């Protein structure tokens, strides 16, 4: 048997649509695998009632098929589905590491990224790596074509998750098909600023680099109370706020000593919009780990 914990992740970070991602130290999924003649899946934990156990419809089933590694697979969900915190990526990454070890495939973490992404395709319709890369490799990741660059960094974060659901497919439909040159220049500047901030573990630069005027406003429309929550977080000391992945989670960066205040402010702001929410006081962390 192999047991692996894989973390929640936040993709895009505002200016890095389909490129940037970070691993969070909490929440996380735990996946256990045992060899079998055919793949079976059992799902428990947060939102398990919404996750199919048919291997042909589950992300870990796709990973098992890609690795030619049939197994009895148990998934203990800690990352809620349709949260914007890389729920499917956490399961796919954990399964990839566990099955790679169980069958002694000898693949590196980097080589497992496209395999885990095949599982992501079941959820979003496309094999994106912006969540599975940090879930496997940890830290801050930059995905460009088939190359993934990883940066170890120490950045405090707050991930606030409201009790509403936004599907990845719906969130992709609202993304504009084209942008202006002015918007492109602004996004490139923000992305460069954020990258420098990650390399320097500088929350002020990371927060400034989250600013983006194309994808974020479109997806924010799907999150009830987004503008109010964003302003509350900034007032409480956040240096930057954006939609986490497809949403509805909202990610804030701040100094470590402001995390508690930022988390409380975001929860209170959602309450004024009649939305229940919880906040994870977290940070950029390691990727999938063997138990």
From Swiss-Prot:
GO terms for biological process: threonine biosynthetic process. GO terms for cellular component: cytoplasm. Coiled coil: none annotated. Belongs to the GHMP kinase family. Homoserine kinase subfamily. It is found in: Cytoplasm. The lineage of its organism: Archaea, Methanobacteriati, Methanobacteriota, Stenosarchaea group, Halobacteria. HAMAP family: Homoser_kinase. This is Homoserine kinase. The keyword Zinc does not apply. It catalyses: L-homoserine + ATP = O-phospho-L-homoserine + ADP + H(+). One of its GO terms (molecular function) is ATP binding. Pathway: Amino-acid biosynthesis; L-threonine biosynthesis; L-threonine from L-aspartate: step 4/5. Its main location: cytoplasm. It comes from Haloquadratum walsbyi (strain DSM 16790 / HBSQ001).
């Amino acid at each position: 048997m192999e047991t692996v914990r894989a973390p929640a992740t936040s993709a895009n970070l505002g200016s890095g649509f389909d490129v940037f991602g970070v691993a969070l130290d909490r929440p996380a999924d735990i996946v256990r695998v045992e060899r079998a003649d055919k793949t079976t899946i059992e799902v428990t934990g947060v939102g398990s009632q919404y996750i199919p156990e048919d291997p042909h419809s589950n992300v870990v089933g796709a990973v098992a098929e890609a690795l030619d590694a049939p197994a009895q697979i148990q998934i203990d969900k800690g990352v809620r589905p349709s949260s914007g915190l890389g729920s499917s990526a956490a399961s796919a990454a954990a399964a990839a590491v566990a099955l790679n070890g169980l069958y002694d495939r000898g693949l590196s973490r980097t080589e497992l990224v496209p395999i885990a992404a095949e599982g992501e395709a079941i959820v979003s319709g496309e094999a994106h790596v912006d969540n599975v890369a940090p879930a496997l490799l940890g830290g801050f990741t930059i995905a460009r074509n088939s190359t993934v660059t990883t940066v170890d960094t120490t950045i405090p974060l707050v991930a606030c998750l409201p009790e509403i659901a936004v599907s990845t497919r719906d969130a992709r439909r609202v993304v504009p098909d084209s942008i202006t040159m002015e918007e492109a220049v602004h996004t490139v500047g923000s992305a460069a600023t954020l990258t420098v901030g990650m390399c320097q573990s500088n929350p002020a630069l990371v927060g400034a680099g989250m600013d983006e005027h194309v994808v974020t406003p479109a997806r924010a429309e799907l999150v009830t109370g987004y503008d109010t929550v964003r302003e509350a977080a900034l007032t409480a000391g956040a240096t930057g706020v954006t939609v986490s992945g497809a949403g509805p989670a909202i990610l804030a960066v701040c100094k470590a000593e402001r995390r508690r205040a930022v988390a409380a402010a975001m929860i209170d702001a959602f309450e004024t919009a009649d939305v229940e929410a919880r906040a994870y006081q977290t940070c950029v962390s390691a990727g999938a780990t063997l138990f």
